[in-house]
Amino acid sequence: MNKLIYYFGNNGSDGNASMKNILGNKGAGLAEMSNLKLPIPNGFTITTELCNYFYKHNNNLPKNFQNELQQAITKLEITTGKIFGSTTSNPLLLSVRSGSTVSMPGMMDTILNLGMNNEVCNALADSCGNKLFALDSYRRFLEMYGSTVLSIPSDLFEQIYEKHKVQADIYKDSDITVELLEKIIDDFKRLHIKYTKQLIKDPYEQLESAIKAVLYSWKNNRAIVYRKLNNISEDFGTAINIQEMVFGNLGKTSATGVVFTRSPSTGEKKLFGEFLINAQGEDIVSGTRTPMPIIANDSNSMQAMMPEVFTKLSQIAKKLEEHYLDMQDIEFTIENNKLYILQTRTAKRTAIAAINIAVQMVEEKLISKEQALMRIDPESLNQLLHTRIDYSKKLTAIAEGLPASPGAATGIVVFSPYDAEKLSHHHKVILVRHDTSPEDINGMHVASGILTIRGGMTSHAAVVARGMGKPCVCGTNNLSIDEQKQILIAGDIVIKQGDIITIDGGSGKIFLGEMPLIQPTFSEESTLILDWADEISSLKVRANAETVNDALVSIKFGAQGIGLCRSEHMFFDKNKIPLVREMIIAPDIERRQCALQKLLPLQTEDFKALFRVMKNKPVNIRLLDPPLHEFLPTTDEDKKNLAHSLNLPLSMIHQRLHAMHEVNPMLGHRGCRLGICLPEIYQMQIEAILTAIFELHKKEHIESNLELMIPLISNVAEIKKLKMDIYAVVKKLEQRYSYKFSFTLGTMIELPRAALGSKKIAKEVDYFSFGTNDLTQTTYGISRDDIASFLPYYLEEKIFESDPFTTLDEEGVGELIKIAIKRGKSSNANLKLGACGEHAGNPTSIAFFHKMNLNYVSCSPYRIPIARIAAAQAKIKQGS
């Protein structure tokens, strides 16, 4: 077995900062600080290999470990001049702390003051001449060891402690006497014996059980949950750091604290932190005492109270930041005016702080632009783009679903798009539905937020909400709607229409009432770092957009064009939907043509508005894609209105609706199949697009950059047929306007057969755009709207590593994309490549698209900054 113990301290170290995999984050930091000659308590690190051995061998330690541990303690005794378990003078007490390879603050266990018993306590009191301190350290040990190692409920210790304080009429911890501490310690001992039938006095037995407790804590519930939330592997294991105790609770010249080298909230370049005099580290964390600031304008700061120590701490903080080239989170203890650094690690920070610090460090010539970009978590930019809930206050959620679209919104509950429109004039509304359909678009548009009982992260509600930049929570299976009573039920809570709720689309939480919100900010530094990203990345970022508002937001966030304009979204405008329904239900070609002719000028104006905003940036328009049933009326009132407008009996409307019913419409009469079977629809759309281009050119001198895209191709014959129809319309309009139209023609690759047949298809088009939503659905045979019913179980059982509709499945779907690119390029070397599914805004998937040499990705407007950073990071990683 490899070496299990590495030393660090005043005499140098066996390790260094590069050894995080075996020493853990904390151990590697201690080793590095030792090499930098910084004042740290002497100690040693037990490697992560012990943790992995422990779990592979039924929670047993290696046979040779006890000897190696004994040698390490002996070496520590020689270094410190103290004896572990000494009952005569100067005893060595230890801290035992976990240390994962990835920082997991507070998730695993720590034991302080280890090695204590009655005799050691007396020896400690004699050696330092401070019995109160010795008893306080013993009391802390019994509590921490009891709750952490022996699993005695921690509140029982707190109850004993508080009971004695009340009986003695003492309210401040600083007023506790020796006599009272002795009584508390006696009761703590009795509690140990009550739960474990013994009081463990042997320091070596304490040490072994503490080591095992830290190892067990690797798989405690909170650590498991934290790793899942942060995608940390179970296989890393934890190291264990054992150090001599240094005491911040020796009196007024001793203290403990935490300092950040810059503000973790804003990134401001000044020390930020807190400390407590006469305390140990857990006192700051527990909140039992109010800490004081490191820097302040009053006499309560460390700068004022301990100026010499403050100067030393400032120098060390600067040295550590310049050494690690990143903001540091530093824990320290002061023992009788002597400063010790207990730990340093890269500090966690808000998104705005991360950006500000990265920009500052480039300007200070500490790091490069590439390093600055790699410091930014792309997903954290959601904090800058959306309103969010202020969780600094304690809040209790009534339910939780899937975080489908980030941001927070407060409003009154409404259960229909009609009520949303009606009430939105005077109130902010939250639209609550079982699920949404394209028919709900007007209600979604006016709503401040959307909540659905069903659906997943790529359901209709989620996709549309992300495109609109609206908060959305989906798949809230612990909620139910009673449509007749118009109520939302969350356990025992009944929410009526008009009641106020708050939803958090970033966490999936739902709250009753109005919650405190934080407004988004987008600073000059944010703009600058995004500009750096564009300088570096080779993958362009476009937007999925079909309205002027979408386009304006996209340009604001740096989109280099529109990569997907879903033309059918324009049909859901209240002025157009009746005409669309007329066109679909029309019993003959003449009536259909009549409805289309009425739609033509409306569509023309829509496209003109979009081209006008985008100027000469590329606009990729997808011809009508969804099945026609999505446009059809569902309410009796709408059916009657349609019958009246067509001058047809209501019974015929019902017959037509029944005739158009499909068992599985998403794999039925949609996409290019509509264009082939009902060619007049695509012909109208193409005429509207080209007329818009011509009128802008002639009347406003605006040149458009059109890309025309055919959806749901599976067969090259489909492309050939539609291509012939498209160019027939183009030729007719060129003759009409005496104008030569210039555009590129492409297709979606969103079916496995299209990917496999891409060699033939590529000969007929200028570009492919991978529609990864449908490609994932058809590769897996899973509906993205129904995956929420089993996805949690698949993730729990590790059948899926992640949601395949959020992070691209490289092994299956990715392989089809590789095949399509290879075969497509073999017959058309100039073939352009893009991706426009939800994956196009996912950083992990963007790295794959970069590797595949795509020209662009196209995502929801509010994902554009995230995609820009992710695209740059993909390029940087490739070059490193």
Curated annotation (Swiss-Prot):
What positions constitute the catalytic site? 460 (tele-phosphohistidine intermediate), 836 (proton donor)
Q: Which Pfam families match?
A: PEP-utilizers, PEP-utilizers_C, PPDK_N
E.C. numbers: 2.7.9.1
Residues given in the record as substrate binding sites: 566, 622, 750, 771-774
Cofactors that this protein relies on: Mg(2+)
Positions of modified residues (Phosphothreonine) = 458
Q: Where is this region: Linker 1?
A: 349-405
User: Describe its PTM?
Assistant: Phosphorylation of Thr-458 in the dark inactivates the enzyme. Dephosphorylation upon light stimulation reactivates the enzyme.
Q: Where is this region: Central?
A: 406-503
- Explain the purpose of this protein: Catalyzes the reversible phosphorylation of pyruvate and phosphate.
Would you identify the family this protein belongs to, as annotated? Belongs to the PEP-utilizing enzyme family.
Query: What is noted besides the main data?
Result: The reaction takes place in three steps, each mediated by a carrier histidine residue located on the surface of the central domain. The two first partial reactions are catalyzed at an active site located on the N-terminal domain, and the third partial reaction is catalyzed at an active site located on the C-terminal domain. For catalytic turnover, the central domain swivels from the concave surface of the N-terminal domain to that of the C-terminal domain.
Oligomeric state and partners?
A: Homodimer.
Name the chain's protein: Pyruvate, phosphate dikinase
Q: Which organism is the protein's source?
A: Rickettsia typhi (strain ATCC VR-144 / Wilmington)
Q: Which gene encodes it?
A: ppdK
